[in-house]
Amino acid sequence: MSLLVTGGVGFVGSHFVRAAVEAGRRVIILDDLSGSAAGGAAAAQSDCQAEGAAIARILALPGVTLQVGDIGDSALVESLCRTHHVTAMLHFAGKIQVGESVRRPELHFDVNFARALSLLEAVRHAGVGQVVFSSTAAVYGTPDQVPIAESARCEPDSPYGRSKRAFEWALMSAEVAHGIKWAALRYFNAAGAHPDGTMREAHHPETHLIPLALDAALGKGPPLSIFGSDYPTADGTCVRDYIHVCDLAAAHLLALRELEHGRSLGPLNLGTGTGYSVRQVLDAAADVVGRPVPQGLAPRRAGDPAQLVADASAARQRLGFAPVRSDLRVLLEDALRSRRHG
């Protein structure tokens, strides 16, 4: 019996694959490599080499198979599930850039909803009855209050958030109609890296604050742009709840265990309950690196709420989940180690 992991070459997906293998699971990765340096349009050769090495390390793990392909290819998905006796799917694949979703909403609805719906139908036809979905705190939009509980109103500010929310509705309906057991894990801000330094965050193009800040401080990237300094927060910059990618991987295994015991979970927040502003993160990054982060101000990005901080109590109560590496300094130190290693 195996797990189908879509997007298993990506940042969160690859960390999950490693955790799953260490827990004794067999994994089939389905990934089109579009988010990797190799699949990017304009990635530096050093990025391609570092990421290629990271992918090779994942594929060298026992019990891991990579199938390069599209999640919307129903025949391929169904064949993979039947051939490898897949019992559950972890769905990480998708478009994640908020700004891009505002410019190209059709792309996000195509990948994050339409193709994901084809994927869901294909695995269901192959007899797969459990789905853990990589959702997002962006489904909440601008919250009425923080921290944000799962019961909060969902009015996403971006097509990215709307496309993710749409697939949550599809999973909810699939449970009613077909008995699918599911969890939609609403990440707040995934960050950090495996503490051994061999796996790092790498999006192409990179849009996440922590890798951009560290690369700027290390002289590996341009000065960091602070998008908006007039938000209704203590220092005028956006506030986010950062959770370590290894903690996210552990939470997925806990959620999978619940589904395998016949307990559907629905939506669950994955965060720490503590928010940090952009300026606070930059100050902490400078302290960890030992040099300032070159930076400048830029206009707000469309679709960015002022604050996103999790009420993480439901995951603690229902999964027994408690982050262990999500202290901001630990998270930054792990991320820095991976960027120096790479």
Language-model-derived ranges and their functions:
Residues 13, 17, 98, 116, ...:
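Alpha-helical structural signal
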Residues 66, 78, 90, 97, ...:
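Generic anion/oxyanion-binding catalytic loop in active/binding sites
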